[in-house]
Amino acid sequence: MNLGVVIKIKRKKAIIVTETGEFKAVNARNGMFLGQKILFDQQDVIENNRNGIGLAYSAAIAGMVAVFVFMFTYFGLHNFNGTFAYVDVDINPSVEFAVNRDGIVVNAEPLNDDGRKVLEELIYKDALLEDVILDLVDKSRKYGFIEDNDRKNIILISAALNSDEQEQRNDFEKKLVDNLMPELENLDVNIEMRFVIASKEQRKKAQENKVSMGKYMIYEMARRQGEKLTLESIMSETLENLLLGQDFGVIETEKTPVNTPVKSTATPTKALAAEITPTKTPEQVVMTPANTPAKPTAAPTKAPAAVAVTSAKTPERATTVPVNTPVKPTDAPTKSPATATATATRAPVKATATPAKTLKPSDTPVKTPDGEQSVKVRFYNNNTLSETGVIYMRINVINTGNAPLDLSDLKLRYYYTIDSESEQRFNCDWSSIGAHNVTGSFGKVNPSRNGADTYVEIGFTKEAGMLQPGESVELNARFSKTDNTQYNKADDYSFNSHYYEYVDWDRITAYISGILKWGREP
């Protein structure tokens, strides 16, 4: 695979510049945008022709290329998909992840049979390493590898970097530990995370012996201490037994509990632990709403929009059932077989013509008439942990109607409890119509209901275009709080804790031009 940056898009073709400064024309993909880093192989390349690549050599494009080549060489973007580090995770399932410089998982390999079993259910490609590890923990709990009792469960993470620079090694360790520790501490299970950096030689030895880097380093440590351990026993023994009484891989914040609080000022890493815990105290929760008392009114649709949709449904249905308007007897012909409403205003002689007309609706009494718009929403959460700082959404919307749908008329709502008032941010990471065509805003459920006091409303720009009957649009999105406090998703109305693939999900509602077309409101 090769890496390139998109510098021009024209219909079904895109011009990219490679790491070596070459121009290539490739087939355009859904969601492609200027400046995007993409992977391509020779099959994607369109043969050069005078009308295609030739225009790339204009002065303007050449100037852009100079910038991109500088970015490649100076910022090291050539490592975008190249493996920057190998990270082995030992729980009992042992799995190795290959990640790029941005901490995105590019590949994964099981290191034992349990790892193979869990990896089959893991969605890891192009996901953040921290999220994948949390998902691995969740799957390990599901299969009983992590016990939900007072027993300590050790997770050993070992990493080998392709870079020899100590600063990069330190940065990688700090980011991974800082991101994972709070998430693991918030789980309702006793987990101790340990972390070690392995050398390239140690990784090579671990590969030769088909064991994780962490366990190979435990083997080396045992041999240095004169213990007669074999690699076979290392592989079969639990981490809790192997590391009993050992401080191997213990993270700085765990080494000194609270014996000498003075040392927390001397060691910056220990001070970090002390600063993490205040975010959990109720003080911060009180401060946040105090900063923004106007927050309820600032919410995009604390407005009656949410209520208006609900109330609009019931009156409409209520007026169609009664016979207020004799013009519409055909809406419910089966409920009044005598067709009294039809003969009431017409001459009795024409009553014989009325039944003939009532037979026609029986062909399609419930079918949508021509031009009717309807959708179906399929969904899953990419992270099923009940407590997390980020809520992920994978959504697939299908046009089930018989008319084109202007996506700018479509709104989707995901309902949840905010738990503690804070500003929130929405991000669309990818969409089949382009992430830049997806919008997100937050609103209040008024009055709040069981499992729902807030919703995120997903919309689409005018540029998103039309969705034809039978076609679908996919998107990967997420939202979080700006103060990085946690969500408890366990009781959230729209949370899907059981699936890792698309399922029809009626707890996300879909509206077309403000009318509910899919789902059940809380």
Curated annotation (Swiss-Prot):
Q: Where are the transmembrane segments?
A: 52-72
Free-text note regarding domains = The CBM3 domain binds to cellulose.
Select a single GO molecular function from the record's annotations and give it: cellulose binding
- What is the species of this protein? Acetivibrio thermocellus (strain ATCC 27405 / DSM 1237 / JCM 9322 / NBRC 103400 / NCIMB 10682 / NRRL B-4536 / VPI 7372)
Principal location class:
membrane
Q: Name one GO biological process term.
A: carbohydrate metabolic process
> Which ranges does the record list as Extracellular topological domains?
73-522
The gene coding this protein? rsgI4
Q: Which residues lie on this side of the membrane: Cytoplasmic?
A: 1-51
The ranges of region (Disordered) come to 311-371
Q: What is this protein called?
A: Anti-sigma-I factor RsgI4
Q: Please name the PROSITE patterns in this protein's record.
A: CBM3, RSGI_N
Supply one GO CC term from the record: plasma membrane
Q: Where found?
A: Cell membrane
| Keyword Coiled coil among UniProt keywords | no
All copies of the RsgI N-terminal anti-sigma domain together span 2-49
